[in-house]
Amino acid sequence: MPIEINKVYCCDSKIGMQELINQGIKVDLIITDPPYDMPCMKPGGKSRIADRLRKEMNELEEAKLHLGISNDYLELMVKLQDKINIYIFCNGKQIEQYLDFFVKKHKCKYDILIWNKTNAMPCYSNKYLTDKEYVLYFRKGGLCNPRCYEDAKTVYQSSLNAIDKKRYGHPTIKPLPFIIKMVKNSSMEGDLILDPFAGSGTTLVASKRLDRNFIGFEIEQKYVDICNQRLQEKEGLLEISN
């Protein structure tokens, strides 16, 4: 499967990344939102909140976005870069895994960015609100060059992405302005950016908007179609590659 830039491929990211390695293709930046490691706990009851939680958990299960990823995927990400330069979304349970791999094993520097959700679901029975998601930024020779104070902030505040989630049909869509900041801070025009878990294509749209090249891998065909729909809206036609 020869891989070309500025295309989205419907395949398992492990297969896609190995093919990039086989072809000798290196990437300058990886921004990705892999599956979170989370238990399949569904609330009982008949309240609107319970119904909404069950619906969201069902969506995550259907898309297999609750199983986490193994270090095999992380090893491939490292092999694809001359300098480690990776943003990876995660939940609190995964932080230890990623720090062990990137910091202990590969001696990376790291920063923790936070997406603070201003309208998180009001569920706090025997727990704190689930009102944030983490982005771990690992680098070893990678570029971190915020242009201004605002770009250097580590906390991004916004509401849940309800409009885009409904429009594009992906359960874990991320805010485009947040991704744009990462692309601006850690790459240059013409660089090649990879998202091995492309989802609805937010990283790819941000890359194209900022004159970066991109490659995306996504295992679900329906989300590959959404990626291409979004890219067509912004930048013209792109083909789907299987």
Residue ranges and their predicted role:
Residues 1-225:
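Core catalytic lobe of class I
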Residues 1-4, 228-242:
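Short, conserved SAM-binding/catalytic segment
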